[in-house]
Amino acid sequence: MARNKPLGKKLRLAAAFKXNRNPPVWVVVKTKRRVTRSPARRHWRRVKLKA
């Protein structure tokens, strides 16, 4: 990927980066481990973004 990115692409990549994480610990505790993983997790090599 180019070092110099357009601002729109940079913002979309940043939003995807933020969304790609586990749920917070307090959610796991509050649901008594019923919710332990996020269905929207994405691996950088397996699933590519349309950004």
Curated annotation (Swiss-Prot):
<keyword id="KW-0689">Ribosomal protein</keyword>
<dbReference type="GO" id="GO:0022625">
    <property type="term" value="C:cytosolic large ribosomal subunit"/>
</dbReference>
<dbReference type="Pfam" id="PF00832">
    <property type="entry name" value="Ribosomal_L39"/>
</dbReference>
<keyword id="KW-0687">Ribonucleoprotein</keyword>
<comment type="similarity">
    <text>Belongs to the eukaryotic ribosomal protein eL39 family.</text>
</comment>
<protein>
    <recommendedName>
        <fullName>Large ribosomal subunit protein eL39</fullName>
    </recommendedName>
</protein>
<dbReference type="GO" id="GO:0003735">
    <property type="term" value="F:structural constituent of ribosome"/>
</dbReference>
<dbReference type="InterPro" id="IPR020083">
    <property type="entry name" value="Ribosomal_eL39_CS"/>
</dbReference>
<dbReference type="InterPro" id="IPR000077">
    <property type="entry name" value="Ribosomal_eL39"/>
</dbReference>
<dbReference type="GO" id="GO:0006412">
    <property type="term" value="P:translation"/>
</dbReference>
<dbReference type="InterPro" id="IPR023626">
    <property type="entry name" value="Ribosomal_eL39_dom_sf"/>
</dbReference>
